Design a protein with these regions (language model features):
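Intrinsically disordered, low-complexity terminal tails/loops enriched in metal-binding residues
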Residues: 11-185
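Bacterial N-terminal signal peptides that target proteins for export
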Residues: 1-9
Length: 185
């Protein structure tokens, strides 16, 4: 009767055989193209940004790389604008319009779960925006390459909350948009 080696013994044998055949230049920590090695080099901020992009693409339904986000602060609230980079990219344009239409419905109901899913945290200002939702208006406007959500309110506390929310978006999406109040278009 022949005894078959256990799975653990086979794994151990393969592991040790692999080590003996391994050349120093093959070790992951010495290969610049090794994904695990590269991941170790990434700062926590870069890891967060990668997560925002990956989660955002999944939640929003369109690519960050093929679109541009802008967050603008106005004296009566602000705006969220998303546009396809390529005027011929009607798939991104349509996905943007669909997503922002959905966001208008959610935000008007005081539901800010979509930004939390993208940013892995509740953005500043959302608790106040939820509490003051009856004083805030969200209007969807189609643009040539996407859409805009115009956020307006006459409530001073709500304006401050909207501005906190938009400033967070500017920073977390790395848009480079001004964080000061500008004139509405």
């Amino acid at each position: 009767m022949i005894n078959a080696p256990s799975a653990a013994a086979v794994c151990a044998l393969c592991f040790f055989a692999g080590i003996q055949q391994e050349k120093p230049e093959d070790k992951p920590q010495e290969k610049p193209s090794c994904p695990m090695h590269e991941q170790q080099k990434i700062s926590p901020e870069e890891q967060h940004q990668e997560g925002v992009v990956q989660r955002g693409d999944r939640v929003m339904g369109f690519s960050h790389e093929r679109t541009a986000h802008h967050f603008l602060l106005y004296s009566d609230g602000g705006a969220i604008e998303v546009e396809a980079n390529d005027a011929q990219d009607t798939a991104s344009r349509d996905a943007i319009r669909s997503h922002l239409g959905h966001i208008v419905t959610l935000f008007a109901a005081g539901d800010f779960s979509a930004p939390m899913l993208i940013h892995a945290q509740n953005p500043p200002g959302t608790e106040e925006m939820k509490r003051l939702r009856e004083t805030i208006r969200y209007k969807l406007e189609n643009t040539e390459r996407g859409a805009r959500i115009r956020i307006t309110t006459k409530n001073v506390e709500a304006v401050h909350a909207v501005h906190k929310f938009l400033r967070f978006q500017i920073a977390d999406h790395l848009t480079g948009d001004p964080t000061e109040i500008t004139k509405a278009p």
